[in-house]
From Swiss-Prot:
Gene: rplE
Name this protein carries in UniProt: Large ribosomal subunit protein uL5
Domain of life: Bacteria
Disulphides: none
InterPro entries per record: Ribosomal_uL5, Ribosomal_uL5_bac-type, Ribosomal_uL5_C, Ribosomal_uL5_dom_sf, Ribosomal_uL5_N
Length: 196
């Protein structure tokens, strides 16, 4: 008989710092602000998706390999190759052709990435004045475009063949943009100040 393995819960030290911050500070702050009756009503981050689109991969397949390598360095996970859903002749694109890569992070990896993004990567963005507050989708999710992959400290600038951007989507359980904005702000996202 095969023995059943027990799931080992991570200790408090093994959990990401932002995960503890969420439980200790963010949840009480949001419960007070939005007057939630139950702790399960408090919005939470469910996943972060990082996508790199490489349209030129048709002409130069090496660009896609570089994007995959860089995305795995940034996120610590193996990227999933994204393929074209339909052919577009103007872009010389065939159906099923590899045109990008994506990583979806959840739980511990998600909080670790968010912490690195907020504390290390965002301050390295040139002429940074805060993240846009208009990039919410109306259902509590937030997307941000990054123009350069070199803002992440994991990327060695000398080994980068070309500057490449990426899309980062933060998916939450929030029902409104206001709740999602409050959640991400409490987690440390540096949003642009609204001018009155």
């Amino acid at each position: 008989m095969a023995e059943k393995k027990e799931k080992v819960k991570p200790t408090e030290q093994q959990k990401a710092r932002l995960e503890n911050t969420y439980k200790d500070k963010v949840v009480p702050a949001l419960m007070e602000r939005f007057k939630y009756k139950n702790i399960m009503m408090v919005p939470r981050l469910t996943k972060i998706s990082v996508n790199i689109g490489v349209g030129e991969a048709a002409a130069e397949p090496k660009l896609l390999e570089t994007a995959i390598q860089e995305l795995s360095q940034i996120t610590g996970q193996k990227p999933q190759i994204r393929k074209a859903r339909k052919a577009i002749s103007n872009f010389k694109l065939r159906e099923g052709q590899a045109i990008g890569c994506r990583v979806t992070m959840r739980k511990k990896y998600m909080y670790e990435f968010l912490e690195r993004f907020v504390t290390l990567a965002v301050p390295r963005i040139r002429d940074f004045r805060g993240l846009s507050t208009t990039s919410f989708d109306g259902r509590g999710n937030y997307s941000v475009g990054v123009r350069e992959q070199i803002i992440f400290p994991e990327i060695d600038i000398d080994k980068v063949p070309r500057i490449q951007g990426m899309d980062i989507s933060f998916v939450t359980t929030a029902k409104t943009d206001e709740e999602a904005f409050a959640l991400l702000s409490e987690l440390g996202m540096p949003f642009r100040k609204k001018n009155n």
